[in-house]
Regions:
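Transmembrane-helix signature of 12-pass secondary carriers
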Residues: 1-470
């Protein structure tokens, strides 16, 4: 890669404020993983208490996703007008309110509606927090800091599966307990500054942005050159017609390649089958003859593998590269689903084949969590130009959650109509399509500053080969 003039030197140290930003990002990711994952085990208790069938189960599971679509779209407007910092404070408050409202829901309908409120916070967090951290972080560790969010999703899922596997814990307690980390997130965010890039672009506050950079950069970091680069870009943005900024700016032809890549990755992270496994693994297994306790233990094991691969990805993504890592891992996920589906289609799904079925599930989680899942929020945080970043990340987040919503609302119905093996094969083919998309469209962004990525877009150089030459 050619170093652009005026780039800040690579400095890998973290100071207290940047570490706190990573912690807040991690808590928001933990809440996302926990609030979405807890429903997997809780549905078994909820269905017994409220006497509900598959349609209501799908509605309860999907409530958080509908709220996430609304939250991701709404929070883009809020973080552009009021700033990333204050928007995250609002999200923290909604996390608290949503968790407590779910815990006291009187019936299935009330629970589904409460999960819509909780989903607003989840969607808002996925749209705002990775972008906020990316705008605060130095480029040399930006990928790893943003992936703290993704890593914490894995932690949340593991905690949720462990809690869900303990039938001694009421589903009301397990869902309401999420209010505690949400309160910690609120207290942590109160200590953090606004994004320096937002301060310059929206407020013209160069001095304020300089103070923020002094707070979040380690000693010895060349703040002036980084500030000059941000300021120069912001001046060019401000000279741009307002019709080329925000939501209206998404119509520009030079922005479109970033939207295609970002939204395409968002769709395929969901179509890869990850949510099918997270939400419904216990239900699918018990419906096909697994003892309930064994199904819950498998769910915990899947969560642990997810977390381990998030940790591995956190440390290698800035070394191996986003594109290369994804291309290596996706074929393994596809093969796992093809083999898994084959067991069910050929009738080899009895107790004698339980170890092989579980091995396929774990292998899928290994390859999926260690590859494609890492890219969902990372690409959205770094791929879009500053003038449209909030709107574009909102579209990407809403695309992801809408795809997730569609899958969650239809999965159990699809399994009833076609069979579990056939559904596994459908998702295996989606993984094949994901690999082709990444190979064809996704450039290697590792080592490029946000401003350098934007220059490639403006120069119409956003194909994988364009970045390979730079």
């Amino acid at each position: 890669m050619t170093q652009a003039a005026g780039q800040a030197p690579r400095t890998n140290g973290l100071n207290g404020h940047m570490l706190m930003a990573a912690v807040v990002s991690a808590i928001s990711g933990l809440l996302y993983g926990y609030d979405t994952g807890i429903i997997s085990g809780a549905l078994l208790q909820i269905s017994e208490e409220f006497h509900i069938g598959n349609t209501i189960k799908e509605t309860i599971a999907a409530g958080i996703l509908l709220g996430a679509v609304i939250g991701s779209l709404s929070c883009s407007l809020l973080c552009e007008r009021f700033g990333r910092h204050r928007t995250i404070l609002l999200i923290c408050c909604v996390f608290i309110a949503g968790s407590l409202t779910c815990a006291v829901a009187p019936n299935a309908v009330g629970l589904a509606l409460a999960r819509v409120l909780l989903g607003f916070a989840v969607g808002g967090a996925t749209q705002t927090v990775p972008m906020y951290v990316a705008e605060l972080a130095p480029k040399s560790i930006r990928g790893r800091l943003v992936l703290c969010f993704q890593l914490a999703i894995g932690v949340g899922i593991v905690i949720a599966t462990i809690v869900g596997a303990s039938e001694a814990v009421s589903w009301r307690v397990s869902i309401g307990a999420a209010a505690a980390p949400a309160l910690l997130m609120l207290l942590g965010q109160l200590r953090l500054p606004e994004s320096p890039r937002w301060l310059i672009l929206r407020k013209g506050d160069v001095e304020g942005a300089e103070e923020v950079l002094k707070e979040v950069r380690p000693k010895g970091y060349d703040i002036r050159t980084e500030l000059d680069e941000i300021t120069a870009l912001a001046r060019r943005q401000q000279r741009t017609d307002r019709s080329h900024q925000g939501w209206r700016g998404l119509r520009q032809a030079w922005v479109r390649p970033a939207l295609v890549v970002g939204c395409g990755i968002a769709v395929f992270t969901q179509l890869s089958g990850i949510e099918m496994i997270i939400y419904y693994a216990p239900t699918i297994l018990t419906d096909n003859g697994f003892p309930r306790a064994d199904a819950l233990r498998v769910s915990v094991a899947l969560g642990v593998v997810y977390l381990v691969m998030m940790i591995v990805g956190l440390w290698i993504v800035d070394k191996v590269g986003r594109r290369r890592l994804t291309l290596v891992m996706v074929p393994g996920a596809a093969l796992s689903l093809f083999v898994l589906g084959g067991f069910y289609i050929t009738g080899h799904d009895g107790r004698a084949y339980v170890p092989a079925i579980v091995a396929c599930l774990l292998a899928f989680m290994f390859f999926n969590a260690g590859g494609l899942q890492l890219m969902g929020w990372l690409t959205g945080s770094e791929i879009y130009p500053l003038s449209v970043r909030a709107a574009a990340t909102s579209v990407q987040s809403a695309t992801l959650w809408s795809t997730n919503l569609l899958i969650t609302l239809t999965l159990l119905t699809m399994i009833s109509a076609f069979g579990v093996g056939q559904v596994f094969w459908i998702y295996a083919f989606f993984n094949v399509a994901a690999w082709l998309f990444v190979w064809w469209k996704m450039p290697e962004l590792t080592g490029h500053s946000l401003e350098d990525i934007e220059r490639h877009l403006k120069n119409h150089e956003f194909q994988p080969d364009d970045f390979a030459r730079s």
